[in-house]
Amino acid sequence: MIVADSPLLKPYRGWPAILDSNLLLLQWCFSFDPSLVSSFKRLNSFQSEDCELLSDTLKVFSSLKTTPHVLTEVSNLANALPRWIKDDWSEHFSRQIQVISEEWSPAAAIATNDFMHLGLTDAALAHLAKTNVILTLDFPLSNSLESQKLKVINFTHLRSLWLE
């Protein structure tokens, strides 16, 4: 299946997208060193085909954005990288931050929304789901956003279509 033709993506063609922490970690680690997909423990649920699917999926959107909360989680997850590549990774991470658009709202504003039970990062994503498409692996987040008719795509559903 051609990703752009997916019924999951068609309604969101041309919208800006925000990746959850795990998908942003996957994208940035793959662009840094593709071998990390098979060797880095934080990415052990992914295969190289997921990187291709993610890359093709992102072409459907007008832009890629993030939040300070997602960046913090990516940074924390990446702390588990082997010591011998951390300096190079830090440089790569810094370069990526320079080119991605960052959206944020004060934590006090986010903490009042109905999604706070999912945690601050997910509540921030929910806060932005009216004007951005959230691409996530997180079932509780995607189900909560879907129930509120907000813009979300569960990457696992795309994987299933991709394999057909």
Name these PLM-found stretches:
Residues E49-L118, A123:
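PIN-domain endoribonuclease scaffold, especially VapC-family toxins
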Residues Q27-S31, S75-N79, N143-Q148:
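A short acidic (Asp/Glu
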Residues D20, D122, D138:
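Acidic active-site catalytic centers that drive phospho-/nucleotidyl reactions
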Residues D122-K130:
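A conserved donor-nucleotide-binding helix/loop in the catalytic core
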Residues M1-G14, A111-D114, L118, K130-V133, ...:
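Acidic, PIN/NYN-like endoribonuclease modules and their adjacent C-terminal/linker elements
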Residues L23-L24, V70, L125, P140-L141:
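Alpha-helix capping/helix-boundary segments
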Residues L19, K65-T66, L135-T136:
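Short beta-strand scaffold positions
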Residues M1-F46:
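Metal-dependent nucleic-acid phosphoesterase active-site entry motif
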